[in-house]
């Protein structure tokens, strides 16, 4: 007589996720949707230009299309109320990030590249906004500290993976298309935990309880935060877009660009822990003002010195501060809108994205007119100081 084999119960199949699983899954999701789907383009661009004849104007247009995709994703997220649809869109973003990264290898036709870069930008929005909103909502429902510092390790790790991965892949597979395909395969390593450990959709009673919490977002507060976050986006994209170019244009620093970009990511990873601690001690607004001040200094350094030390210190300062500004700002606005943190984050991010589209154009025109980036760096420092002044008008958040 054979023993009857009972199927596993629903409880066994759907065990509650642990905090480390949700965080690690979110980190892997960020590496996939930001580090690969968005940032792999930066270190792979030189090979694409050398081997396909892609000129600077067309390369810049692809970057703009990518930012356009990010803005489109932020717009969708800003008007998405149903948590189930936010969860579905985030899940689709994980698949799209994997496929669009590999698809870049299939053709050297510019319109095809533009399509994949647009979708890659869309994926970035799902990881940055929907993923962070889902994780923050899960933390609040579990009664845990509603901070996103650990989650945003994925941003720094994504930069490191894209920078060092491209350097290694170029030595093994010199062809640009092989490198894109290899990044797509590499994405599977991050896709699996990101997919398996997605924050679950809250049950109806929990969702209703959170939805009952009144939002704490006055119009003046939101506009002030949006304008200061615009300044942060300006500072972020100038360094993210031109750091490698600025370094490579210094004769004494030629060939060091990829290492400087990797240093940005290495600085960002531990910094997220530090900024959460700083915010607990000083309050969120004061911590943000400190991050703005330090990032301004890191932007000015390459403008006043062309030394390798200035490039490295500037990269360290930039990596350590941009991640703090993003993490503290999104967590702050998410806590003030517990019924739909992802939606509130997305609306704020529209100003950050607008700066990402405008700033490179202004900086590029200034660099073309002056023959260098110093003027653009000084303008960026002024914009960052204006953002810090706006923050000073807000009541502190302890």
Locations of regions flagged by a protein language model:
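C-terminal transmembrane helical hairpin of 12-TM major facilitator-type secondary transporters
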Residues: 285-329
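Helix-to-loop junctions at the C-terminal end of transmembrane segments
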Residues: 73-85, 271-283, 367
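Cytoplasmic helix-loop-helix junction between adjacent transmembrane helices
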Residues: 116-154
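Paired small-residue
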Residues: 111-120, 309-317
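Helix-loop-helix hairpin linking two adjacent transmembrane segments in secondary transporters
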Residues: 110, 141-199
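Conserved MFS/SLC helix-loop-helix module at the cytosolic interface between two early adjacent transmembrane helices
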Residues: 72-109
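Extracytoplasmic gate region of multi-pass secondary transporters
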Residues: 42, 221-262, 269-270
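A late C-terminal transmembrane helix in Major Facilitator Superfamily
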Residues: 339-372, 380
């Amino acid at each position: 007589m054979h023993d009857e084999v009972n199927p596993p119960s629903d409880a066994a199949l759907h065990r509650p996720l642990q905090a480390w699983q949700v965080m690690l899954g979110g980190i892997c999701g960020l590496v996939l949707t930001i580090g690969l789907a968005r940032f792999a383009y930066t270190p792979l661009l030189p090979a694409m230009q050398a081997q396909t004849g892609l000129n600077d104007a067309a390369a810049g247009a692809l970057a703009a299309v990518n930012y356009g995709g990010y803005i489109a994703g932020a717009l969708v997220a800003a008007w998405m109320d149903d948590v189930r649809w936010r969860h579905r869109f985030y899940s689709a973003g994980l698949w799209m990030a994997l496929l669009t990264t590999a698809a870049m290898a299939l053709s050297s036709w510019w319109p095809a590249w533009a399509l994949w870069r647009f979708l890659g930008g869309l994926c970035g929005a799902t990881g940055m906004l929907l993923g962070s909103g889902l994780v923050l909502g899960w933390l609040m429902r579990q009664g845990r500290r509603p901070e996103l510092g650990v989650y945003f390790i994925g941003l720094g790790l994504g930069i490191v993976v894209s920078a060092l991965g491209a350097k290694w892949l170029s030595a093994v597979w010199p062809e640009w298309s092989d490198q894109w395909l290899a990044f797509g395969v590499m994405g599977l390593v991050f896709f699996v935990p990101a997919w398996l450990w997605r924050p679950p959709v809250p049950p109806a009673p929990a969702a209703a309880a959170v939805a009952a919490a009144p939002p704490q977002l006055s119009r003046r507060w939101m506009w002030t935060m949006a304008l200061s976050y615009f300044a942060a986006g300006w500072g972020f994209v100038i360094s993210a877009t031109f750091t490698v170019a600025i370094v490579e244009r210094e004769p004494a620093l030629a060939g060091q660009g990829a290492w400087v970009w990797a240093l940005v990511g290495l600085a960002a990873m531990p910094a997220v822990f530090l900024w959460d601690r700083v915010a607990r001690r000083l309050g969120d607004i004061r911590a943000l003002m400190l991050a703005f001040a330090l990032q301004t200094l890191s932007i000015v350094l390459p403008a006043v010195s062309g030394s390798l030390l200035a490039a490295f210190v500037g990269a360290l300062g930039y990596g350590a501060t941009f991640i703090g500004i993003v993490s503290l700002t999104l967590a702050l606005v998410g806590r003030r809108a517990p019924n739909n943190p992802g939606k509130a984050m997305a609306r704020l991010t529209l100003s950050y994205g607008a700066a990402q589209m405008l700033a490179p154009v202004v900086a590029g025109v200034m660099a073309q007119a002056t023959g260098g980036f110093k003027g653009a760096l000084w303008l960026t420092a002024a914009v960052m100081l204006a953002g810090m002044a706006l923050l000073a008008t807000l009541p502190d958040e302890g």
